[in-house]
Amino acid sequence: MCYDDKARPPMPPTNGGQAQGQDLVLTAADGNQFAAFLAQPESPAGAQILIYPDVRGLHGFYKDLALRFAETGVRALAIDYFGRTAGLAPRDDSFEFMPHVQQLSISNIFADAQAALDYLREGADRPAFVVGFCIGGSLTLLTAGQDLGLAGVIAFYAGMSRDFGGYGTALDRATQVKYPVLGLFGGADPGIPPEQVAELDSRLDQAGVPHDIVTYPDAPHSFFDRKATDYAAASADAWRRMLSFIETYSRTST
């Protein structure tokens, strides 16, 4: 598990704007209904971002993260993966996520992502990014191989060994990535060996896309957490890199 119910995202360095959040139910092309949370900035900065959660789906950490993005001016939409198998119920600590993770289909993930991006673009035709955490980081890298018109993707501690129903792992598909990538990893994360991170960097070179792969040497998996004060400097740097990445590739995508 990546984040529990007590986890909260660190505050961004440029926080100070106002934001409004609302729960939504979106519908994919196949009729699947899934939960989402939209955070709307009072003063939009010209970009928007789709948030892929960890294995627990759309829980409080990601609703808060959407609001933190919106407070920097970035319109944000966090989505849940499990509408097809777990319905629309809240995803708290009692949610038994693994049976639903095992039923995930990559084609269904892409369908839900398309519906979410369509919703964002209907409300504002601005550059769109994707950010994901843990399994969401893996899915972010896989999504980056699709023709979705993204400006860039950001992957936190993306696992590279999960094969989604024979589609291949994030590492298998890395040479097919189409958009700029910011990858953020913990050097003390036992689940993601440094050799895999180095191989991801190499395969993104082969893909020919701009990329910045960053490892924080002593940080564990899930270091990006307000209560993980030992890694506050890494979290602050991750925020700075994310906002700079969004600003840079918002300009180049227009």
Q: Residue ranges of each PLM-predicted region?
A:
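N-terminal cap/leader regions of alpha/beta-hydrolase-fold enzymes
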Residues: 1-254
